[in-house]
Regions:
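Carbohydrate transferase catalytic cores enriched for Leloir-type hexosyltransferases
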Residues: 1-179
């Protein structure tokens, strides 16, 4: 709403995501700057940290895999641990959304001078009933919806979402799951 961004180049990898992430984590390749020549800084907004020889900024949203590894797959834990090691060794700046996450980063061995708190921020505005109705009509959203998004991993509790849907379906047999 009222936000405009300059035209940004977008480059897709030929590698499937899982292979690309593993390649970054274990080989440091492909380099981000090879995909977008002229790039001056690389910002990884997740634990998917590309290989680069440029200044590297990484946003660390949480270190839940250290506190509750049981909520992650074995593969996920290995991936996050390896990513953390790469961030420790190679990130010039680490952004944390809260003081608690910043402290977790330091406790995990990231130098405190590289960790900066930058809170998540979003400006919201009230939406009128008329705007909601217009949007629902424009997108043919006549019914009630429950939306789940996320990766399929234990900490996302998809089985809990499906269990809740079963209960909902018993009370409202017309309820359905759509992909």
């Amino acid at each position: 709403v009222g936000l405009s961004l300059p035209s940004l180049p977008l480059q897709f990898s030929r590698l499937p995501r899982r292979l690309l992430y593993d390649s970054w984590n274990y080989l440091g390749r492909p380099l981000a700057e090879a995909a977008l020549p002229g790039t001056q800084v690389v910002h990884a907004t997740t634990w998917a940290v590309p290989g680069t020889h440029l200044p590297l900024v990484v946003t660390v949203h949480d270190l839940a895999f250290l506190r509750s590894p049981e909520h992650f797959t074995a593969r996920g834990n290995r991936y996050f641990q390896r990513s953390l090691a790469r961030v420790r060794a190679g990130a010039d700046v680490v952004i944390a959304p809260s003081r608690a996450t910043a402290e977790d980063c330091v406790d995990a061995g990231i130098a405190s001078k590289r960790v900066h708190v930058v809170p998540h921020g979003v400006r919201t505005r009230p939406v009128t009933d008329a705007e909601v109705t217009a949007f629902r009509d424009a997108h043919d959203l006549g019914g009630e919806y429950v939306l789940w998004t996320g990766t399929h991993e234990p900490r996302k509790n998809l089985s809990g979402v499906l269990g809740a849907f079963r209960l909902l379906h018993r009370a409202h047999p017309a309820a359905e799951i759509r992909r």
